[in-house]
Every structure is written in C-alpha cells, then in structure tokens.
Amino acid sequence: MFKDELLASYRDGALDDLNQRFTLFEARGSHEMVTVGPVPFSSLCAHHLLPFHGVAHVGYIPDKWLVGLSKIPRVVEHFARLLQMQERMTTQIADYLDANLHPQGLIVLVEARHLCMECRGVKTSGAITRTSALRGVAKSSSEVREEFYRLLSR
C-alpha cells in the first residue's frame, strides 16, 4: 500500500511518466485565466507519517501554451504521493507548472486537514491549513489574484 499507492512518486520513472503525459497545446489567442479545482488529494506528513488530505486549486494565465486539463490533477497527485509538508508540496506544484507551461502568471492554492494536528499534539479537529504559491504576474498584480479568488468562490 505505501509503496504502490501512498508513496507512488518515489517509484523509478514516476517523474518521467508525468513529463511524458504533460500535453501542451498552442494558446492561439487564449490568454485569459484558466482555473482547475478543487482537485482532491491525500498525502503523508513527512514529520509524523500521518495523512493529510484536502484540495488544490490552480489558476494560470497562458502565454504560448495551454495544458491538457487532466494534467493538472496528475501534477497534484504526483507531488502528493511523496512524504510531504504542505508548504513544500504547494511550491513543487507551482514550480513544475511554471517550468513546463511557462504561463504569464500562476497561482496554486492548497487547502488541507492534517491528522497530525487532529490526532496528536494540539488535537484541533477540523482546522484547515491554506498555502499558496504565486508566479509571474500573479505575484505583482492584485487584479490577477482577485480574479483567481473570485473564480474560486463561484
């Protein structure tokens, strides 16, 4: 279960498989924000080896390329299937998409519940941790960020 499911991205060739399936299409005048989410995921906390689970939301503004929409959940799944910290996973998803898609702007928002917070230590049931990563114009433009969050609230 651990090797084949929960930690599947440690398998030799897992990143190569992801790269081969990362299909790009010419944007051809499509330069408005694209959002995908909520994308459900489960991962294992690198500190406590307890699960955390939640959803990821991705928004990007294409430059030259659009990505096949099913590829974004594949990217989330790939990075969730490693021993993780939510902050690192959020950054890894953003870095991968930025490096392979080269968008004008990119936002990744991850929301998760951590069993290490619910079952031990502070024992806070139901707390949601939110992390974000911004790239390109999303970092410098409040309008881009507002559009992303507005699209999420629909």
Which ranges hold each PLM region?
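A domain-level signal for the structural core that forms small-molecule/cofactor-binding pockets
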Residues: 1-154
